[in-house]
Amino acid sequence: MSKATLAIYGIKDRNQLHYPAYTHDHNLCLMQDGRVLQYLQLERYTRRKYDNRLDLFLEELIDKGLLQLPEEFDLVSVNAFVGNAFITSGGKLRFEANRLSHLSENLESAWGYYQYETWQGREIEAYNCSQELAHIASCLPFYGAFQENSLLVHLDGAASLSNFSAFLYKGGKIQLLEYGWEMKYLANFYNDNALSFAMIGAAPGEHTSVPGKLMGYACWGDYRADIEQWLAEHNYFKEYWHREEEIFASIAETFGLSIESFNSTIPFWQDVAATLQHIFSREVIDKFCQLQQQTGARYLYYAGGCALNIVTNTQLLETGLFEQVYIPPCCNDSGLSLGAASLCEWLKGNTIATHSPYLNTLGLIPPQQQFSSELITDIAKLLMAGKVLGVCNGFGEAGPRALGNRSLLALANDKKLAERVSIHIKKREWYRPIAPIMLAEIVQEVASTPIQPLAKYMLMDFHIKDDYRAALAGVVHVNGTARIQVIESKDDNPLMYALLSHLYKEYGVLALINTSFNVRGEPIIHRPVEALAAMPRMGLDGVVIEYKLYLPDGLEEDRDLVR
């Protein structure tokens, strides 16, 4: 048994704000012999969305026994462009490293100290990991070792020394190809652009929520070459903060339109969003084409926040550039510690095991995963009656997507029901799509898009055949696509497989709405007690907690359904 690896992403932000600024989504991962022992996105524990205060909570997690550190472990810290050092609030865990001057193909030696008891501590073996490598290596715990002749790419808003980096895995080694900031302007569309923020009504502190909103909004419009030219001439209006009147005046002069607000129902803004998305997809895919031609790579491993762009992912798959494309479920910063720990374990010579996405473990009791057929029948009856149910089973998902363990479920055939879930329960904007969960054999029937590994993690779109759009009305977006989570077998998620199979066999139901168990601005539910408290607060019709069904007080008609 090799020494364990503790990896952290906890670089301190530059500003003491009530929201994350330059760093966000702090997380930690403990691995040994290639297996994840414990993992936590900090927000799930603290209940503060995108929480970036790991320095304030790490000692608490250790002292409470939630993070079960062995006597001996190696420490890996993921750095950021804002810095390298990490120290806990009480000084018990310390990490220091030299500032990176160039992007490495390896971990960099650093200095670490761990005080395991009062007045007793020791130096520990420590390594500094770039965000670029940590992002890419976050593929390892979900897809296993990199395949020979693979392109490894990271793309996000800002990492350690770049926002875009590319490596080639060949001959058992990671070889750096390039890194830099040339594609930063594209990422800025989604996290640092005055026009984008204004169109979707986002305040500066809400930058972490902009990408998902803008991608959903873009599907309502159409690409226009004249809008692209206008955007380019004004540097995409990136710095036009609080200069709305100048933007409106430019529209009037260029297009002859009188627009005086950023009302999201105005078609011009929808076309602007669609044009930004078109530019992003075109330029990113062109870059992948260039790198594939340069290297002859057969496979692509892709991570970073930009890998959550579903439209681009789908178009990339459709090019057929690579034999296979791999993106992890936690491809944004929430997966950095998983990547760093996996990279360190791999460099130690350990084989990285293939894991399920259900890795958020701290503070939770190991799941039983045993349920009765009566539970499936009862859940199905409630869903067929138009009810909305929450699910909190086992460990939580790694990353921003709910994949059946921390989900809200409802029938997928009703737009009104979908609006209830998305707008009234989750408090989301009208233009954002809501996604389904579906058995693989049903996907092959209703969609014209081939199933890819990304579908297991809701990271691609499927084009829904016309004949099935009415039966899936609640989850088909305005552009005729659906971001399906595909369930291949009961091993993916036993309860969801059993439920979907029962619903199809008994009622002909093709899919369910599957969206994250939270409301806008809050983290996904983590602990059972939170799920139970959320039921009345969110107006849910019931919750399934550790494979038991709970109904709100006073709903006797629902109790009659499941007796």
PLM feature segments, named:
Residues 57-74, 288-296:
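Phosphate/pyrophosphate-binding loops at sites that engage ATP/ADP/AMP, CoA/4′-phosphopantetheine
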Residues 274-300:
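Phosphate/ATP-binding catalytic cores across multiple sugar-kinase/actin-like superfamilies
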Residues 7, 14-49, 128, 133-134, ...:
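Flexible beta->alpha loop and helix N-cap segments adjacent to enzyme active/binding sites
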Residues 67-114, 129, 138:
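Short beta-strand-loop/turn "lid" adjacent to the catalytic site in phosphate-handling enzymes
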Residues 216-278:
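Active-site cores of enzymes that catalyze phosphoryl transfer or operate on phosphate-rich substrates
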Residues 299-316:
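Glycine-rich phosphate-binding loops at beta-strand->alpha-helix junctions
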Residues 1-7:
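Extreme N-terminal starter segment of soluble prokaryotic enzymes
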Residues 8-11, 34, 39-43, 75-90:
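Short loop/turn segments at strand-loop or loop-helix junctions that form parts
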